[in-house]
Curated annotation (Swiss-Prot):
Protein name, as recorded: Nocturnin
SUPFAM superfamilies linked to this entry: DNase I-like
Gene designation per UniProt: Noct
Record-annotated membrane-spanning stretches: none
Pfam short name (any one): Exo_endo_phos
Summary of the function given for this chain in its UniProt record: Phosphatase which catalyzes the conversion of NADP(+) to NAD(+) and of NADPH to NADH. Shows a small preference for NADPH over NADP(+). Represses translation and promotes degradation of target mRNA molecules. Plays an important role in post-transcriptional regulation of metabolic genes under circadian control. Exerts a rhythmic post-transcriptional control of genes necessary for metabolic functions including nutrient absorption, glucose/insulin sensitivity, lipid metabolism, adipogenesis, inflammation and osteogenesis.
Sequence similarity: Belongs to the CCR4/nocturin family.
GO CC terms, sorted: cytoplasm; mitochondrion; nucleus; P-body; perinuclear region of cytoplasm
Coiled-coil region list: none
Record field: compositional bias (Low complexity): 39-55
Length: 428
């Protein structure tokens, strides 16, 4: 039976929060933070928030051995298989008949009701990086974010200073949506997405986004009891601004073996200017001791992108959680690639050459971890960064670090505005 978008999204919200009907009556409510400096006027499509997904439960991790043995076991089982073959049920497109716009005001009120006991969202400002105002078209806003898989946050990541209540999905998903809506990205690149089909795809599609999801073949989320399926990478773009020309799902290889890490690369055409570019999202292998493995994965991704962009003829933006500090080989491969890539967040440093001190900050049982692992790379000769969202300060993050009641992930979102450089034929 057909359900209106309003009724359907309300049902998704209420399914996760059986007590929400009581919170929707008049009472104290958490208000959304005012627009951040540099944000754009909200369009009707980007004024909504909503939620929906599986009920949050205590998670039990299945004994699967250590990370090394588990990965090699997975590799041995999947050398001749693909992620799509492993999880075809997670690659089915939603019924387009139901993809109608959300009523923004009512759904935003529902999200506010869910979050009414939470402290306000962190405030972050955009830094103006323009050197001129020559572009005749609006910039392209790109958001990169590892949103923290729900199964991992509750089951495996052991955030010892984060209250269990702060990880409840019925509230955390609303914080994630609030962050996305606050910055209104034209393109959204996400990692650790394990609620694509029941939350992000149905809601973002009603905001005008077209989405693609590529799960990890052997996601660690599947080891957690009551999981919501595998996590993976997701890429969304606004259909009002871009036309999809080509889309490629990439299962990364290392040392000739297919690995558990993936990427999505899409060639888009700007409807305003007719200019084309490639946007890619990835999530490389985590943990200390896997530096050479990440390096091999990065080289494989660069080779794939070289082919897709026809040897840098098509401008490129690469977003990802690389799980690698700037001192690692995989970072150096991207910085020295023939694709002429630059890291956007270096531009926030005084000399324009240094990465931020951190993009993730957490406390686990093994100790406190503060690292720079997330990046937005771009074709320096074809594109310019006109602004970038500043990072949270240590004082804002607080002594218990991330995630928290204020912020839904252990990784900070990165947001940049890009403009095409003029005279592309000469620059390329």
């Amino acid at each position: 039976m057909y359900q209106s978008p309003r009724r359907l999204c309300s049902a998704l919200l209420l399914r996760d929060a059986p007590g929400l009907r009581r919170t929707l009556v008049p009472g104290p409510r958490r208000t959304l933070a005012p627009p951040v400096l540099g944000s754009r006027p909200a369009s009707p499509q980007l004024q909504a928030a909503a939620s929906g997904a599986a009920r949050s439960r205590p998670r039990t991790v299945s004994p699967m051995g250590n990370g090394t043995s588990r990965l090699y076991s997975a590799l041995a089982k999947t050398i001749n298989s693909s992620a799509a073959a492993q999880h075809p049920e997670y690659l089915v497109s939603a019924d387009p008949e139901h993809l109608e716009p959300i009523d923004p005001k009512e759904l935003l009120e529902e999200c506010r009701a869910v979050l009414h006991t939470r402290p306000p969202r962190y405030q972050r400002d955009f830094v103006d990086l323009r050197t001129d105002c020559s572009s005749s078209h609006p910039p392209i806003r790109v958001m990169q974010w590892n949103i923290l898989a729900q199964a991992l946050g509750e089951g495996k990541d052991n955030f010892v200073q984060c209250p269990v209540e702060a990880l409840k999905w019925e509230e955390r998903k609303c914080l994630i949506l609030e962050e996305i809506l606050a910055y209104q990205p034209d393109i959204l690149c996400l990692q650790e997405v394990d609620h694509y089909f029941d939350t992000f795809q149905p809601l973002l599609s009603r905001l005008g986004y077209q989405g693609t999801f590529f799960p990890k073949p052997w996601s660690p989320c599947l080891d957690v009891e009551h999981n919501n399926g595998p996590d993976g990478c997701a890429l969304f773009f606004l259909q009002s601004r871009f036309k999809l020309i080509n889309s490629t799902n990439i299962r990364l290889t290392a040392m000739t073996l297919k690995t558990n890490q993936v990427a999505i690369a899409q060639t888009l055409e700007c409807k305003e200017s007719g200019r084309q570019f490639c946007i890619a999202v990835t999530h490389l292998k985590a943990r200390t001791g896997w530096e050479r493995f990440r390096s091999a994965q990065g080289c494989d991704l660069l080779q794939n992108l070289q082919n897709i962009t026809e040897g840098a003829k098509i401008p490129l933006i690469v977003c990802g959680d690389f799980n690698a500090e700037p001192t690692e080989e995989v970072y150096k491969h991207f910085a020295s690639s023939s694709l002429n890539l630059n890291s956007a967040y270096k531009l926030l440093s005084p000399d324009g050459q240094s990465e931020p001190p951190y993009t993730t900050w957490k406390i686990r049982t093994s100790g406190e971890c503060r690292h720079t692992l997330d990046y937005i790379w771009y074709s320096r000769h074809a594109l310019s960064v006109t602004s970038a969202l500043d990072l949270l300060t240590e004082e804002q993050i607080g002594p218990n670090r991330l995630p928290s009641f204020h912020y839904p992930s252990d990784h900070l979102s990165l947001v940049c505005d890009f403009s095409f450089n003029e005279e592309p034929d000469e620059l390329l």
